[in-house]
Amino acid sequence: MRKILLLFFVSSLFANNFEISPKNISQCKNQICKNILNHYANFMKKIEHESFIRKLELINSYLNSLMPRYDDFYNTNVDVWSTRSEFLRRGGGDCEEYAISKRDSLKDLGVDNQKCLLVVQEKKTKKYHMVLAVWENLHKEPLILDNLSFRVLPLSKRYDLVPEYCLMDGKYFKIKKDGISLEPINIRMQTYENLIKKEKEEKFWKN
């Protein structure tokens, strides 16, 4: 009985009650912003026990419903990417901010699988774009969550995209020709490193 109680106590310490931090709420400038944050928190509570695939589908669809704002990813003079808090408070963002917010949402839902911010090139337009790549396991190709698509598909089924490089845990990789494994590459992106610094200083949830 003591072991059961101890396990329950320890698990409750690390449980996420999905309650927005007061500091996060205080940075809202209007009621719409507060409503977005609270609705997101309730959504996270609702889906926390869904399956791996279902979580990916639901998070992708939910965040894709927020308005895109094409304001900075293609502008080389802007070196700021928004955190999940900033993205939600603003009620939308650019492609990289959808990918960042999906990554953080899945992590908070207990999806600890390997995931990276994947920079791709669109074959048709030749423009660069960012999506979230998530590996169900390291022997399978990643699944792609894209703000331009409500479907979660394996990378090989995204015929319209060419993977360029992958940002994960402060490091840089490229996806090998097998479409599954990663290889370190020697590049640096100041925008990504600035994002990491901001995220370390930010407290999204109350607990």
Name each region found by the language model.
Residues A15-N207:
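A structural boundary/capping signal
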Residues K3-L13:
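Sec-dependent N-terminal signal peptides
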Residues M1-R2, F52:
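Structural motif marking the loop-to-transmembrane transition
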